[in-house]
Amino acid sequence: MHRVQNVQSHVGEYAPDILVVGSCFLDYVGYVDHMPQVGETMHSESFHKGFGGKGANQAVAAGRLGAKVAMVSMVGTDGDGSDYIKELERNGVHTAYMLRTGKSSTGLAMILVDTKSSNNEIVICPNATNYFTPELLRAQTSNYEKILHTGLKYLICQNEIPLPTTLDTIKEAHSRGVYTVFNSAPAPKPAEVEQIKPFLPYVSLFCPNEVEAALITGMKVTDTESAFRAIKALQQLGVRDVVITLGAAGFALSENGAEPVHVTGKHVKAVDTTGAGDCFVGSMVYFMSRGRNLLEACKRANECAAISVTRKGTQLSYPHPSELPAGVT
C-alpha cells in the first residue's frame, strides 16, 4: 500500500523555499577502536540508533538553521517510519508529502566508526526506498504540482534513492525554473554515470566529492589543480555551478563559469565524520536561500560541517544558529 502521509501539525498552506527529494534511513552506529578484519568478531565501545539517510540529513541541516524546507521520501508504515516523520518535524522539516509503503520496512544503514581515525564504513539496506519510483511520485503529487509549487527556490537531490526518480525530479524542477542541486553521493556505479551525464544540463549546481567528480569526468581529482580541471569539464557537460568537496582540504568551486577558487578546510579534532558532507550541502543551500552567493554560502557551510565532525552522531551533530561562530549568518 502506498499513500501520502498528511501530518496534522502543519495547518494551512506551507510554501517552502527548499525541497529535498531523497532518502530517510535509520542509522545503527557502532563505535570501535579499529575496523574488523575478515572473520573477526569484536565488541563496540558504544552504540546508538539514530536518524540518517542523505536526503533527510540535508533537510535537517537546513531545518535546524531555520530554513523553510520540506522533505519528500519513502518510509515504511512501521513504527520506524512514524518515528522518522516526527523527528523531521522536530527539526523544522515539513513532512506533508512524505510517502509510506506497507511493502517493506523503513530503510536502514549499518555504520562502524573508528574512534581513533574518525573514519567510517557504511552498509545501506534501502528497504522502502526501493519503492520510491518516479511513477509513484508523479501519481502521488499530481505530476509534481503539489511539491514543485510556484515560489519554490531550491531542489536538493542525492544518489541514494532510485536514480530515475532523482533525474525525473531534477528535470521537472528545472523546467519550472527551480534552482536544482544534485549531490551525487553515494558514488554512482558506471551504468549510473552514463545515465547522469545527459541530465547534467538540468542541474544548476552539481556538488560531488573528489571521487564522484572523477567518476563523472574521467579525471582523477587529487589536488586543487585537478579539482579545477574537473570543474571545467563538468561545466562543459552543461552544469552552471560546481562545488567539489575535498574533505579536510575544504572545497573548490566555480559559479556561473567563473574561474574556479579553492577554500581550505577548517582544522578541528574530528570525532565522527558521518554525515558531514550532508551537513555541508544542506547548510550551503540554506545560506543561499538567505541571499548569500555560492562562495559565501559554502564558507558558512564549511563552518557548520566542521562543528558536526566534533560530535558523535549524524543529524544530532548538526548545529543550530546559536552554536555558530560570530558572523556566520
From Swiss-Prot:
Pfam family, one: PfkB
Residues annotated as binding K(+): D272, T274, S308, R311, G313, S317
EC number: 2.7.1.15
Protein localization: Cytoplasm; Nucleus
Keyword flag ATP-binding: yes
CC cofactor: Mg(2+)
Coiled-coil region(s): none
Role summary: Catalyzes the phosphorylation of ribose at O-5 in a reaction requiring ATP and magnesium. The resulting D-ribose-5-phosphate can then be used either for sythesis of nucleotides, histidine, and tryptophan, or as a component of the pentose phosphate pathway. Specifically phosphorylates D-ribose. Fails to phosphorylate 4, 5 or 6 D-carbon sugars (erythrose, threose, xylulose, arabinose, fructose and glucose).
Protein name: Ribokinase
Native species: Leishmania major
